[in-house]
C-alpha cells in the first residue's frame, strides 16, 4: 500500500508527453513526424538532451519548471507499433493516463490547426489505433496537429496520402508550425487540474493565421 501511494505521489506533479512518428534520420522532417519536431523545439528551449532508453523503447528527455517535471518521449518504434512504446512507458512509471499527452499529426485538419481531445477513437490514425489496442482504452489525451490534405489525385488516393504524410515539411510550413509549437508548449506548461477546460478550449480555437 505504501509503495502504491508513493508512486501516485511521485508522478502527480509530472507530465508525460509522447510524440508519435517514425525513427530514423530520413523521416525526421516528415509531416508524419510533426510531434518529433515539437519535442525537438521543446528540448532545445529548455536545454534538455534526448538519450535512448531501450526498456521504454524510446528516446527520452526531461526538464523541470517550478518543481514540475516534464518527461518527453520519442518512441523508437515505427508509427504502426507506437502502442508497444506507450505501453512500456505507462507500465514502467505506473502513471495515471490523465498525465499522458500523445502528440500526433492529422491529415484531416488544416496546417497548424490544433485539436485537443481527452478521449476518442483513432480517427483512422494507425499510431493511435495501436495505442488504443495496447492500452485497451480510448481514454487518454491526444493533441492533433493539422498537416493539411494532400493535393487531389483521383487516380490513386492512397498513394497520394502516403506521399503527403511522408513528405517533408516545407520552409513556409515550418514558419507556421513554429508558432503552433510555441503556443502548445506554453499551454502544456500552464495546464493544470483547475484551468484544464479553459486551456483545451483556447488551444482548439487557436488560429494560426492570425499569428503569422
Task: List PLM regions with ranges.
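Nucleotide and nucleotide-moiety/phosphate-recognizing core
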Residues: 3-118, 129-144, 150-163, 174-209
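Phosphate- and other anionic-substrate recognition elements at nucleic-acid/protein interfaces
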Residues: 122
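Intrinsically disordered, low-complexity regions enriched in acidic/Ser/Thr/Pro/Gln residues
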Residues: 165-168
